[in-house]
Amino acid sequence: MKDGFIKAAAGTPDVRVADCEFNATEIIRMVHEMEEQGAKVMVFPELCITAYTCGDLFWQENLLEEAKVQLVRIAEETADVDALIFVGLPLEYKGKLYNVAAGLNHGEILGFVPKINLPNYNEFYEARYFTSGENLDGTVHIDRDVYRARYESDTESDDVEFEIEMSEFDGFEELEELEEDEEPDYIDENDEEEDGELYEEDIWISPNMIFTCEEMPKLQIAAEICEDLWV
């Protein structure tokens, strides 16, 4: 922070349609470039893990699973980056497909924010594939050991080990939607093994989340995807 301001960055990585591994590699590369420039909030395009133009491939289970594998990879390979990072992916929840932004910080997947307003005109066909996330409120279970094993089986790199340390911008957490006069209830979405190693998570999915910094309580960030900003 300088003079009460933080630096935000928007990145547009090169992507290949349905090539989640390539796209994740580009996202990770850009995160580290942004880090070198001092960015503390990093925003990537909607559906950047799969690419936006997958069409009917969005219905392929293999694509949806690989998107989650690469989301875990992005989270873990940027665990040492002191920033709040948003990336986009398709996410299946209770039999329906959502266009979501995932908030990441220090290796944690903090929450999924679903898109509400789905364009279905001209060259846009989002309603063909996705469901509006309006009024959605629940948790998505992510077994990180399973997804970690999948991407590590395709690489010779060492295991990614990290700790979540207190720092100026550590500890973005999600807030549930608050009723009137209700006090904020911080969510601890992480299940841990006895040795403290992150094992699995139940991660909130809702359009009504605010990401706030523990060290700077007045820094509160919401995510809106494309048309949600102006409709």
Model-derived regions, located:
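Enzyme catalytic cores with a strong preference for nitrogen-chemistry domains
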Residues: 1-231
